[in-house]
Amino acid sequence: MALNPDRLFSAEPGTREIARRLFASVEKLPIISPHGHTEPIWYARNEAFPDPASLFVKPDHYITRMLYSQGHSLESLGIASRDGRPSETDARKIWRLFATNWYLFRATPSRLWFEHAMETVFGITERLSQENADRIFDAIADQLTQPHMRPRALYDRFNIEAISTTDAATDPLIYHDEVIASGWHGRIIPAYRPDAAVDAGRPDFASEVEKLVGVAGTPLTWQGYLDAHRNRREYFKRRGATSSDHGHPTAQTADLSAGDASRLFDRVIKGNASTSDAEMFRAQMLTEMARMSIDDGLVMQIHPGSFRNHNPTVFERFGLDKGADIPRQTGFVDQLKPLLDAFGNDPRLTVILFTLDETALSRELAPLAGHYPALKLGPAWWFFDSPEGILRYRKLTTETAGFYNTVGFNDDTRAYLSIPARHDMARRVDCAYLAGLVADHRLEEDEAYEVAHDLAYRLAKQTYKL
């Protein structure tokens, strides 16, 4: 299983040699992780991870969705159900099931990330299998008890410079405060994710809004609601936040008059919003968040286009983030126009657009980001955060948007040990792409070195104000 030093590079010798040189120049750059879903309590408490299954299997919906697709119940993977049905609690049994089915992950990015962690973090070069499952489980479990495997030690070992978590608008951020108070040098910052108090289609929307204005100490009115967001954004900024994040079903925006927006708020806060009112409210709030970003400087990320909880049976029994979110088409040109008409020409605003609709990359997103000063393209995301996905992204966007209307790489992960693996993969694929441009005489090699550095490090640091 030993990692091949030429993985993800071209098989053509000349191009491969260029890629080697480029990668050598960026391989050891610090990691900027400006968007992700690791838990702030890890860094605050610095406790040992419990066991291999809890580290690699249970929290990783890339893993659990593949196993579920092959008929393995989520309970057998240790996922707790809402209805109290028993789920597997024996970490070794969960690991054995994972190991027995490891062949399912052939040619997937999950395999690349996992095997990178096995070798570079644990020193394990055997390919996982049913036969060696217990031995590898024991080897990992033994190392997890050691001080060098605590979250803060791994932060240094991974050469992370900054990492952003993703946090609800009403989160008190106590673990971020604990990190700051501890005097530890690690930079763990929050990102403002207000979806629960913005998505009027959620059954708990009204209660989330009440919680928001309660925490902020503002009245339950349209203006009070907006002031509550401003209050919380400032609270996040004082703890280092540089960005907000918005995971909406679509990229629809709106620019209503103050009166129309206030009346819309009065309708949706009653808790029985129509589908059209819920969509209009989300749309208006993207524009309001852009307005706030101009005032307070938070970089705005929009992650649209996921059909969340496509499998109602899984959602009802297990809740969110269980692998049943499916990409859907997204129409950026028309949906973003109200926001862009209002603020798209303002260089004080940075809106980073992500997509699960690859067909939109060359047709809509690259032309939009290649024109509007306020827009940047986020990297290949979620299902497409893979060698082929990143390569397609570069091929579909570079000719129209260039490199400098993109923002480098986000690992966007819940799996802490996959962070260096994901950055390694992105750097390798980008270097392979740049090597091809050099070999085709479309880019000079000295330029390729500069671009490789920018894609691996500078663009993320600059765009996210880190």
Swiss-Prot record:
Give the Gene3D superfamilies listed for this entry. Metal-dependent hydrolases, uronate isomerase, domain 2, chain A
The record's listing under Pfam families reads: UxaC
Any one GO molecular-function label of the UniProt entry: glucuronate isomerase activity
Q: Which EC main class describes this enzyme?
A: isomerase
Its Gene Ontology biological processes? D-galacturonate catabolic process; D-glucuronate catabolic process
- Look up the signal peptide feature and give its range: none
Cystine bridges: which residues?
Answer: none
Q: Which InterPro entries match?
A: Metal_Hydrolase, Uronate_isomerase
> Which pathway does it operate in?
Carbohydrate metabolism; pentose and glucuronate interconversion
Q: Which residues cross the membrane?
A: none
- EC number, UniProt record: 5.3.1.12
Read off the HAMAP family from this record.
UxaC
What the record says about family reads:
Belongs to the metallo-dependent hydrolases superfamily. Uronate isomerase family.
Q: What's the protein here called?
A: Uronate isomerase
Species of the source: Brucella melitensis biotype 1 (strain ATCC 23456 / CCUG 17765 / NCTC 10094 / 16M)
